[in-house]
C-alpha cells in the first residue's frame, strides 16, 4: 500500500469510528457555511484564487443542471402522431418530441461548422527565438549594440512593401528568403497548382510572427485561387481562399500548402 494511504490502512485494520457516517454528514453540511465565510473574509491573492476556483465550479454546476433539465423536459407536442395530413410547406419539418433531441441537433450543427474549418495540421512544434532570429550587431566604432534581428525563416511581404531606413529597421527580412507563390494542393480535386500568396493570416507560433509574415509549418495563408475557377453557391467567382503550410519551407526551398475547403 502507498505510504500516503495510512488512513485507509488504519480503517482496514481497526475499522471506522461508530459515528463516522454522522461526522461525515455534518462535515458536508458545514461546507456551504465554510465557503460563504471564506468568500467574505479572504483578502488579496488568496481571495482572487478562491473566487476563480468557485467561478469554475459554478460553471460546471450550471452545465450539469442544464443537462439534467434537457433530459427531463418534454415539449408540448402530442404523444401520438397526428393522423390529419399536413400541407405541402410543412412536410419538411421534423416532429421533435423532447428538448434533448433539439439540443442534440443544435450541437451537431455546431460540430459540423467547427469541422468545416478544421486544419490538416492541428498541432505543430514550437520554434524558439534563438532559432527564429539571428542577432545583428551594429555600431560605428564598437559593435556592442545588438538590438537588430535577422529573420532566418522564409517570409512573405506584399508588393507594396518598403523597407524602413536602415537606422530604424529592427527586423531584417532577407531578399533570398522572401516567397510570393505557394504550391497549393486541393484535397478534393487532387491537383497541385502554384498560386500567388495574398497575405499571412495566422502563424501558430506567435502574433508577432504573423505581423512579420513569417512562413513556418502550420501557418495559415491566403492564396489567390481565381485560376482554379471555384465559384460560390450564388455563382460568384472565389478570389481568395485559406491554405495551411505543410512543410518546412527553409529546408525545401518552396512553400507547400493544403487548401482549406
Curated annotation (Swiss-Prot):
Location(s), subcellular: Nucleus, Nucleolus
Regions of compositional bias (Basic residues) in chain numbering: 45-65
Family named by the database record: Belongs to the eukaryotic ribosomal protein eS8 family. Ribosome biogenesis protein NSA2 subfamily.
Subunit structure of this chain's protein: Component of the pre-66S ribosomal particle. Interacts with NOP7 and RRP1. Interacts with RSA4 (via WD repeats).
Chief localization: nucleus
A Gene Ontology BP annotation from the UniProt entry: rRNA processing
CDD domains according to UniProt: NSA2
UniProt keyword terms in alphabetical order: Nucleus, Ribonucleoprotein, Ribosome biogenesis, rRNA processing
Organism this protein belongs to: Coccidioides immitis (strain RS)
Annotated motif Nuclear localization signal 2, positions: 51-58
Motif (Nuclear localization signal 1): 15-22
Disulfide topology: none
Any matching Pfam family: Ribosomal_S8e
Name assigned to this protein: Ribosome biogenesis protein NSA2
Region (Disordered): 1-87
PANTHER family: RIBOSOME BIOGENESIS PROTEIN NSA2 HOMOLOG
Keyword Nuclease: no
Example of a GO cellular component annotation carried by this entry: nucleolus
Feature: compositional bias, Basic and acidic residues: 1-36
Role of this protein: Involved in the biogenesis of the 60S ribosomal subunit. May play a part in the quality control of pre-60S particles.
Amino acid at each position: 500500500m502507498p505510504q500516503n494511504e495510512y488512513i485507509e490502512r488504519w480503517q482496514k485494520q481497526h475499522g471506522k469510528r461508530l459515528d463516522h457516517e454522522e461526522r461525515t454528514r455534518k462535515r458536508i453540511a458545514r461546507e456551504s457555511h465554510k465557503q460563504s465565510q471564506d468568500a467574505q473574509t479572504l483578502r488579496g491573492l488568496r481571495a482572487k484564487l478562491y473566487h476563480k476556483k468557485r467561478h469554475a465550479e459554478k460553471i460546471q454546476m450550471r452545465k450539469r443542471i442544464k443537462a439534467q433539465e434537457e433530459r427531463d423536459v418534454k415539449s408540448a407536442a402530442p404523444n401520438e402522431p397526428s393522423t390529419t395530413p399536413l400541407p405541402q410547406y410543412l412536410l419538411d419539418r421534423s416532429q421533435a418530441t423532447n428538448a434533448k433531441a433539439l439540443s442534440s441537433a443544435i450541437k451537431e450543427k455546431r460540430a459540423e461548422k467547427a469541422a468545416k474549418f478544421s486544419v490538416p495540421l492541428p498541432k505543430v512544434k514550437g520554434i524558439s527565438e534563438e532559432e527564429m532570429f539571428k542577432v545583428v550587431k551594429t555600431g560605428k566604432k564598437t559593435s556592442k549594440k545588438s538590438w537588430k534581428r535577422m529573420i532566418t525563416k522564409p517570409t512573405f511581404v506584399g508588393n507594396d512593401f518598403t523597407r524602413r531606413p536602415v537606422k530604424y529597421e529592427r527586423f531584417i527580412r532577407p531578399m533570398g528568403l522572401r516567397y510570393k507563390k505557394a504550391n497549393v494542393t486541393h484535397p478534393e480535386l487532387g491537383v497541385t497548382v502554384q498560386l500567388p500568396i495574398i497575405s499571412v493570416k495566422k502563424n501558430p507560433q506567435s502574433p508577432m510572427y504573423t505581423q512579420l509574415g513569417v512562413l513556418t509549418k502550420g501557418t495559415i495563408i491566403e492564396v489567390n485561387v481565381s485560376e482554379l475557377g471555384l465559384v460560390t453557391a450564388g455563382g460568384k467567382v472565389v478570389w481568395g481562399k485559406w491554405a495551411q503550410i505543410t512543410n518546412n519551407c527553409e529546408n525545401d526551398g518552396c512553400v507547400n500548402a493544403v487548401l482549406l475547403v
